Amino acid sequence: SGLHALIYYRFSHWLYRHHCLFLARMVSQFARFMTGVEIHPGATIGRGLFIDHGSGVVIGETAIIGDNCTIYQGVTLGGTGKDHGKRHPTLEDNVLIGSGAKVLGPFTVGANSRIAAGAVVLDEVPPNATAVGVPARVVRVNGRKVDSDMDQVHIPDPVSQELCRLRGMIEQLEKEVKLLKTNKGEGQHEDL
């Protein structure tokens, strides 16, 4: 269905560019009915887009898709309803978007980036990055893991940190008490 959706899109986009807006929308709505893929005729799509198992894919009017991108089923390239003018995302070349991901807003997803299945992307993604989660966060750039303040596996334990601090204070107090006992035995009193 992805190939057929793109064939219909190319025709509806041609109509759209030639100011036959009503016919362009008719063709795109017919394509949505036939393929389950909704591509607005105003969207700009480069060469080599692959829509795999396309059912449920939605591509908004001001979306721009570069060359050789891959989009899986259930992906939305949409707006948030807060913006005017350019409302939809721009995908640079060689971007892959996993099943069910939502990329919402007028920002850029950099070249060679990957968006994980089910991610909700609301902010810019740099080139050569991998973004995951809801809301999406970048976890890899250029194949290297990115440190995250919200790493749920290695997040600092505040109770453990407090216990360590208290142990340190106890050790310091024990040293001071020992020093006081030593000084008292010698008959000297020293201010600490």
PLM regions and their residue ranges:
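Structural signal for interior beta-strand "rungs" in well-ordered beta-sheet cores
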Residues: 32-139
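C-terminal segments of enzyme domains that contribute to small-molecule binding surfaces
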Residues: 86-89, 93-98, 102-103, 134-192
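A transmembrane-helix-recognition feature enriched in membrane-embedded lipid enzymes
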Residues: 1-35
